[in-house]
């Protein structure tokens, strides 16, 4: 059975950014994820959200969001998987370090990766990617 957009998964930075911009589809998707099994993000996405803050108010909002979110770390196995993918796909597909780390976090945790940028990940063997909206 193919995973649906309500299956537990890791949420990519692009969807989180949409939610901070109050995009209704992103907010509805995050609400469904939270209700179903909670929201999971990579520490890389948490850092990207933090780096995107323009002021103390936005930073506080991001911190409050992350307090209610499971933030998955970069483990040794995540690092090794990401490094292998970088070696295999950087030159041919332009795979970037943050994308490799986020994808490897999802892969190693056995989770679907939810992203609007499915083309960034389509070459990665064994990774399940869904565009949720």
Model-assigned labels for residue ranges:
Residues 16-17, 47-50, 122, 130:
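Nucleotide phosphate-binding site architecture
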Residues 2-7, 69-116:
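Active-site neighborhoods of divalent-metal-dependent phosphate/nucleic-acid chemistry enzymes
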Residues 15-16, 45, 78, 101-102, ...:
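Alpha-helix capping/helix-boundary segments
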Residues 26-27, 46, 59-62, 79-82, ...:
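A general structural signal for well-ordered alpha-helical segments in protein cores
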